[in-house]
């Protein structure tokens, strides 16, 4: 019997797993933004010492995992599981990072929802007694994403006002059965939502319906409400997607009010950095969570947040064939450190 299941999509964790350590790696533009002081490793080299941007993204995950192990006082052999993914075809950023390390690995593709998805699965593995610890990790890179999903940088294509800037960064979090730190008390698994948005330069619009569907499901399943949280944090809707989410909630009689924020509007200073509609990418929510948010929770400045990773489930092939962009969102409830 699924004793921990709540409603249609959610579950609780009676013995909440603990996020004991976290690490973040940020690129040049991200290191010039308002959250720069919260990142562990900051690089001015977009290649991270490698020959290609794709190899640079692999290097970011390697740095994040290494920093996580260092902070936790652990060796690679001490990790029971790694849940990770990225935006590169076949998730080569993650698999190349972990090759020959001997760590059991489950690769994920949730697009930009991957940080929340990996955290959700880590909490299930640890909370269910299948592992003593698990690592949730992801990354993205502006240049590799532009080349894969839109146009190579050398093409010089104009960006539309609705376009977002893919974050160059990687985040890793260690989830354990005991210890001190923020605790994961419950999660909501998202459903794939498709309202027919086809513009690959307007992913906030494609993801906003999925974000609202998951947030509403969490409220319904867990018998909770916006006022029960200090923040409701979406992954990378950007400014436009955030406004659409607020409107969807208003139409349904739900006031998210001053509770809602979005990692895509936090990681950059849009007035100074000109990222159009905001940040995006797996790394957007990853470095915001593993830099700023977990630090605030651990320090007691935030008591409880609903972390909602949002993903646009497109591919180059689906875009070229004119197909719409499905969205997904997974929610993780994180309570302050003890």
Which ranges hold each PLM region?
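Active-site-adjacent elements of ketosynthase-type condensing enzymes
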Residues: 86-102, 142-155, 241-242, 288, ...
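Acidic, glycine-rich active-site loops and adjacent beta-strand->loop/helix elements
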Residues: 85-90, 112-113, 138-144, 190-192, ...
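Short, well-ordered amphipathic alpha-helical segments that serve as non-catalytic structural scaffolds
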Residues: 57-73, 119-121, 206-221, 288-293
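Condensing-enzyme catalytic core mediating Claisen C-C bond formation in acyl metabolism
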Residues: 1-54, 152-216, 221-224, 255-274, ...
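Active-site-proximal alpha-helical scaffold in enzymes
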Residues: 109-136, 175, 280-301
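Internal helical hairpin/lid segments
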Residues: 232-294
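Conserved beta-ketoacyl condensing-enzyme motif
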Residues: 19, 54-112, 228-243
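Short glycine/threonine-rich loop-to-helix capping motif typified by GTGT followed
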Residues: 95-98, 237-252, 317-325
């Amino acid at each position: 019997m699924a004793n921990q299941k709540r409603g249609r999509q959610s579950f609780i964790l009676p013995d909440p797993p603990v996020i004991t350590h976290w690490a973040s790696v940020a690129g040049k533009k991200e290191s010039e933004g308002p959250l720069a002081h919260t990142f562990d490793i900051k690089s001015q080299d977009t290649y991270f010492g490698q020959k290609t941007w794709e190899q640079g993204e692999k290097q970011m995950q390697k740095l994040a995992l290494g920093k996580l192990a260092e902070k936790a006082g652990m060796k690679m052999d001490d990790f029971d599981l790694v849940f990770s993914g990225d935006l590169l075809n076949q998730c080569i950023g993650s698999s190349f990072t972990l090759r020959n390390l001997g760590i059991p690995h489950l690769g994920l593709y949730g697009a930009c929802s991957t940080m929340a998805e990996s955290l959700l699965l880590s909490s299930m593995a640890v909370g269910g007694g299948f592992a003593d610890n698990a690592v949730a990790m992801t990354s993205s890179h502006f240049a590799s994403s532009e080349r894969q999903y839109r146009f190579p940088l050398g093409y010089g294509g104009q960006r539309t006002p609705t376009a977002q800037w893919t974050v160059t960064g990687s985040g890793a979090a260690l989830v354990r059965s005991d210890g001190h730190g923020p605790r994961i008390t419950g999660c909501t698994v998202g459903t794939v939502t498709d309202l027919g948005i086809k513009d690959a330069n307007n992913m906030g619009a494609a993801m906003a319906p999925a974000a609202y569907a998951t947030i509403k499901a969490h409220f319904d399943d867990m018998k909770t409400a916006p006022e029960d949280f200090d923040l409701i944090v979406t992954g990378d809707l950007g400014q436009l997607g955030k406004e659409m989410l607020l409107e969807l909630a208003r139409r349904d009689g739900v006031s998210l009010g001053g509770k809602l924020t979005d990692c895509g509007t936090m990681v950059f200073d849009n007035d100074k950095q000109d990222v159009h509609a905001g940040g995006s990418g797996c790394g957007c929510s990853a470095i915001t969570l593993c830099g700023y948010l977990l630090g605030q929770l651990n320090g007691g400045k935030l008591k409880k947040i609903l972390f909602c990773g949002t993903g646009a489930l497109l591919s180059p092939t689906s875009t070229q064939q004119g197909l719409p962009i499905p969205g997904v969102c997974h929610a993780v409830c994180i309570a302050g450190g003890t």
